[in-house]
Amino acid sequence: MRIIRFEESSGFVLAAVTDEQQVFPLPHSDFMELVRESEQQQTTPLRLVQEMMTSVQPLEKKLEDLTLLVPLEAAEVWACGVTYERSREARNYEATGGKMDSATFYDKVYDAKRPEIFFKSTAARTVGPNQDVYLRSDSNWQIPEPELGLVLTREGKIVGYTAGNDMSCRDIEGENPLYLPQAKMWRGSCSIGPSIRLAETVSDPYAFEIICRIYRDGEKVVDGSANTSQLKRKYEELVEYLVRDNSLFDGTVLLTGTCIVPPDDFTLADGDRIEIEISGIGILTNPVKSQATKNISI
Ligand code: DO4
Ligand code: MG
């Protein structure tokens, strides 16, 4: 069972639930409203949507014909780093100029009790399915980071799973780790979607298959896959550090780190198309644009 948000031709935004065959509109403005109503009714989001599906007509349009939006407008997106061996290896490569000759703080954080967690994005910087992600104009080495996202209540309860892209500049971070916020955060540097999978419908959250494909001029130039079984840490451990002495917004998204890194000689280019597919969540597709073509004001 997956929750989506979409825009009607009138411009009206609706949340909806899909069982893959059909799409049923929900009377909620977004996923967190559904979660809160289920709490008030002392039921679960799954039971609530199942009940609603018996009393509303499905849309005439199919899922693939809808204009999807971010599945929730997360006020904050946070992200974890170096939670997979592949990320540690890639970070060491960029920090040592490819020499990999000495232990780094990335080795340290991979093994440390405290995970790396950083602030990634705000609602205004985050885009949804089929919307453009943007390249930084002062970086020559940029990649998508395909990651599983945890959807959290303000108490830190995991109520859903989504897919996310932690767009990153390997040259800026590699030059100096203190540049991390600049390597990670700019307009259009984060995407989430296409849906939220209800947590209670996932029997093993350490068995998500993650696939990343990048297309250039119609050709597939990157094709990588990974599985959340390779994650070094537990989700509860990551959330525990995020909520510690912190206040969360309802619907905060926590990206759990990347295990797919394109080849070291690869950098994203204007016109590329990124696809991030997570089993049971769907395909998050984003065209890549250079900042020169963007016209926004945040
Ligand atoms: O240490 C930098 C961040 C690494 C990261 O974003 C990841 O592992 O996904
Ligand atoms: Mg990342």
Provide a role label for each language-model segment.
Residues M1-I3, F12-V13, E147, E209-I211, ...:
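Short, acidic/polar N-cap/turn motifs at the starts of alpha helices
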Residues M1-R86, A103, E237, N286-I298:
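Generic N-terminal segment detector
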Residues E7-S10, V17-Q22, L152-K157, Y215-E219, ...:
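Short acidic-glycine loop/turn motifs at beta-strand connectors
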Residues S9, R170-I298:
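Catalytic-pocket segment enriched in acidic/His residues
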Residues D30, N165, N227-T228:
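A generic structural motif
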Residues R47-R216:
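Active-site microenvironments in enzyme catalytic cores
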